[in-house]
Amino acid sequence: MKPLHFAPLQGYTQHAYRSIHARHIGGVCSYYTPFIRYEKGGVRRKDMVDILPENNEGVPLVPQIIASGTDEFNYLCEAIQEKGYKRIDLNMGCPAPMQTKLGRGSALLSAPQIVEELARQMTQRPDVRFSVKMRLGWKQPDEWRHVLPILHELPLAHITMHPRIGIQQYKGEVDMEMFRAFYEECRHPLVYNGDLQTLDDLARIESEFPQLSGLMMGRGLLGNPFISAEYASGTEWHWADRRDVVLRMHDDWLQFCRQKYVSDSQVLLQIKPFWEYQKTWIEKKIYKQLMKSGSFRNYMTAIQRFSNQ
């Protein structure tokens, strides 16, 4: 069994969700924040609220940043260090056009000179242990060959590799042949990320790449929140146990939404994403009722039907 990391997903894995998952399920060595970015002269208030220590008690949290160059990088690091954090993850893998057009995320993989400048800045912050999340490249799957030697000069905690290129976004297949080449050359602890959905997926990657230092799941863990505990215990849960723990998570998430939002319609809008990725294990009819409910009353009726299954 390898340490399991929870990848961030914008709009889903904010502090309340992370805390609820850690409290009810666990099995995760590190939870990563959705990337924090420089925008309109500073950091968005909601991003700073998301990393406040009091909002993340009991959660092994790693703030993740995305930057196009040293100015943004240093601004973000300062803001995060002021909150007491000594771990920061640099996102060099995001494929979202809104970020890559600014030279951030996976676009950095085609600009090794900027990566080198960022690396120099990392060495100026000895109190922070950095990690890097990246892809094979931006436009070509061998662009990592120009970046990895730069990263080898740093005392990184680890590198997380998602074996696609940026312009693929999440389409097509992961390139496992090129991942193996990276795996064989990487001298840092290496974490695998990409298309991990099931316990069998985790076991397969662990078996094929035994020297990995960890595995990272994002959408797969959102869709099967209990899989981290199943993986840690080596035992697949019964369906009823899965349902019960997810309903406990849901109750806490509902309470959070009710405290934050006034109207039932606002609560309903915010709570539905909790289920969005979970259609693989929930009965199709129930899932549809949860997602299509037009009123809070109908939504709670669907929850009751689910709990009675």
Stretches with model-predicted labels:
Residues L4, Q10, A16, E117-R120, ...:
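Alpha/beta catalytic cores of nucleotide-metabolism and tRNA/nucleoside-modifying enzymes
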Residues C77-I88, M92-P97, L102, Q113-H188:
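Alpha/beta enzyme core
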Residues G41-V43, Q169, N224-E230:
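Short, charged, surface-exposed secondary-structure boundary motifs
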Residues L9-G11, I36-Y38, I66-S68, G93-P95, ...:
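Active-site beta-loop-alpha junctions enriched in small/polar residues
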